[in-house]
Amino acid sequence: MSTLLFDRLTAAALFPLLIGALPAIADPSDHPESDTEQEIVVLGTRETAGDPTLSSGPVTERMSQSSRSIERDLLIAAGAYRLGDALELVSGVSSQNNRGGMLDNFAIRGFLGTPDGGAEYYVDGFLANRGMAPPRDPATVERIELLKGPAGALFGDVDPGGRVNIVSKTPKFDPAASATFTYGSFDTRRVELDATAPLSSTLAARLVVAAEDSDGWRDTVSLKRRTVAPSLTWEPHAGLRFTYIGEITRFDAPFDRGVPALNGDANAVPRSNFYGEPGDGITRFRNQRHQLTALADVGGDWSLNGGVAWRTGSLRGFSSDQSRLVGNALWRQRRSRDFVVDDLSARIELAGRIGAHRVSIGAKGYLLDYAERWMRVNPSAANSYAIDVLNPVYGAVPPVLRPFTDNHEKRWSGTLYAQDMWEATDRLTLTGGVRYDAYRQQIRNNRTGAIGRTIDDPVQFRLAGRYKVADAIALHAAWGESFVLNSGTDRFGTGFAPETAKGYELGASGAWRGIDVAVTWFDIRKRGILTNDPTDSNFLAPIGSLRAHGIEFDGSLKLDSRWQLVANYAWTHARADDDAFATDRVLNVPHHSGSIFALGRFLDADARGFSLSAGLAYMGDRAGAIDGSGLVLPAYVKAKAAVEYALSRQVSLRAEADNLFDAHYAQSSYSPMWIFPGAPRTLRFSLRITS
């Protein structure tokens, strides 16, 4: 593809910057009717209407029957202080390596993100962790969408496994404020403040602030994080709305690689043991997001929505990471990290109706600038930099670091996409989509001067159908393909080909008053997925191909206004097909997993009373390594429970326990040396005040 065409496509994708000209064409007297056909299953109670500039659209909500939206009230009731806590409420999700505690990482339907960068996730429809991003703070979250399968499109982006989209809180024109104060185990202190109000008849503002400090349950591993999220909504008239959302995050903690396995036992050493060096200090993660979206009614049943998001971040710090076990001496590798990311994204989409067709056409693009500089020194018999695995004593003199990796990556990507949902009959709905991507990727090795370039323009397609057997029962089928660019280089300094995928799903769903159930069979194949190199785990390597197929069940039950039950189960058979790896099993992906969560509310007419909740999560045996060790992370069951008492509409008290029975388990693993243990029993007590 010519450079000129590429530049034109990128410019087209950045067209939302011109959306400020829309008032001239927006007619306030002729705006679209609200969509009453939303069918995505809502877990919890949706308190605010979906914003089409931030979340999945009506086509995805109608056609992706295996998708779920987890609302804020259920996130609070379930004690979801981390993204992984929330994803336990949906089938087919498992925890992955958290990169020293510095990121959110998970697998969906057996497919994982890179061990270093983590699984991709979106915030308000924009990819939010391209390159890197710190763990999400729950204070800013309105809802979390898990969009599964080829029909789970988000502004043209599709993954046959699934995508996570976190929808942010936005301003309201009705004044409201809340403050939550939490104290818990390990001297954890947390404060959340949230206030929103109109500034005029057309302008509203919101400010969310969160601060958390904890001594942590791992020896010498503390945590400090701060989040400030201002937002503004401007509605000059009924047919036009602009929303700005900002987010500034600071995340400070020692880099923590967890614990090693002893004699093949992932739970052999005390889970509180820290094998780094307190003298390394903290690793500092800084992240800023600034986002502007707009929605305009352009007449009839047509609307135009678009936005631009700019994100910058940095991660810097030192660590002493487990490398090799010789007797009781745990050799360590000394490292430093200096990562910087600058990511600019934009999109625009025109959507509307033509008879029985719901059509959308969009353009999007991004510019990524990502630099990674590592220094390290490997241990040796002469200088093992060791620590006793059974009785760690700190204070070893760190070896002098040497240059290791110094890469600078740049990407330019432009996308055009279109989709059509055709209501063929009152029972049959069909949809199809096409996506054209044009990209350039350049990775420069600053140590050697070598430059790797990739230019391509792939096209992907997807198809889906839904048939209503009865008013309450529907069958669905979907097929689609996708691709994702990979970052980084292998042990030879060579960049990676993109990750590509094809997959289908078949399923049935039922929706009766207070009951939602869905059963789905999926079969997906991907190529080019990155995992740790079996020859040298300090580097990444692509898996030739990976296939995952399985069955998922998701169900929710609401009994009057008091009781709600959410349950899920997944059987996932994920296998790699690459002779370079000693095993065909996939890291941290269980055959069987599931959870159940129950919530009961008992409030009087003045909103006084109490709420009870309890849940169980099961995770089956998982591969803990892909080398020849055969390490297996044992299955576990984890319980949680909470009680909340509302003294009035404005004041409530809450006590909760996570890992109620203090199960000792391995949460995830990167290798036999880097296993992250699950947290012990954790108690939290909260006071919430609202106005």
Language-model segments: residues:
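C-terminal beta-signal and adjacent terminal beta-strands/loops
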Residues: 4, 617-625, 644-691
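Acidic, small-polar-rich N-terminal luminal/periplasmic segments of exported/outer-membrane proteins
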Residues: 36-174, 506
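Outer-membrane beta-barrel translocator/receptor signature
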Residues: 117, 130, 140-142, 153-230, ...
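Repeated loop/turn-to-beta-strand initiation elements of outer-membrane beta-barrel proteins
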Residues: 202-205, 239-242, 301-304, 356-359, ...
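Acidic/polar loop-and-plug regions of large Gram-negative outer-membrane beta-barrel proteins
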Residues: 212, 216, 229-235, 239-297, ...
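Structural signature of Gram-negative outer-membrane beta-barrels, strongest in the C-terminal barrel
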Residues: 235-237, 356-368, 407-526, 558, ...
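Membrane-embedded beta-barrel scaffold of Gram-negative outer-membrane proteins
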Residues: 291-321, 468, 476, 498-558, ...
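Gram-negative outer-membrane beta-barrel transporters
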Residues: 346, 350-353, 425-430, 523, ...
